Amino acid sequence: MKKVFILLALKYYILNSIIRNGENLYKKIVIPTDGSDVSLEAAKHAINIAKEFDAEVYAIYVVDVSPFVGLPAEGSWELISELLKEEGQEALKKVKKMAEEWGVKIHTEMLEGVPANEIVEFAEKKKADLIVMGTTGKTGLERILLGSVAERVIKNAHCPVLVVKKPKKE
């Protein structure tokens, strides 16, 4: 009985510590997704938080135009863009299905641009309280050359960012 009381007291303390002035701290949560396993894992965390606090969820997919700027062939960009948009629709569909299964209200949106910039701008526009995203955990030269979308979002976001790291292989 004592253990049950301690667990209930702990849950009560945690819930009260993230509620301000009688309002939930998290009302709007943004989930950037690329369809990868780690982004879907991040979506699970975000949807769980949203369920707990009755928050709205915005799942977004950003068609990254930066690698294709300056392509010589005219039709190349249109073809690549269409493929990326199809990939984005699939990624958003997975997150939407997950949210609906949990009974969480979700909006999906496809954006185009530089991912970190678009994520930050979207979160600001929607007045999001939290961004939840995955990261592959790039290291070394790859990180120096390419940077980390999650790192740039953390540096520039107006709200807290929860980053879910790719699990280590066993």
Curated annotation (Swiss-Prot):
Gene3D superfamilies in alphabetical order: HUPs
Top-level division of the source organism's lineage: Archaea
Pfam family, one: Usp
Native source species: Methanocaldococcus jannaschii (strain ATCC 43067 / DSM 2661 / JAL-1 / JCM 10045 / NBRC 100440) (Methanococcus jannaschii)
Protein family according to the UniProt entry: Belongs to the universal stress protein A family.
Alphabetized InterPro entries for the sequence: Rossmann-like_a/b/a_fold (IPR014729), Universal_stress_UspA (IPR006015), UspA (IPR006016)
Entry protein name: Universal stress protein MJ0531
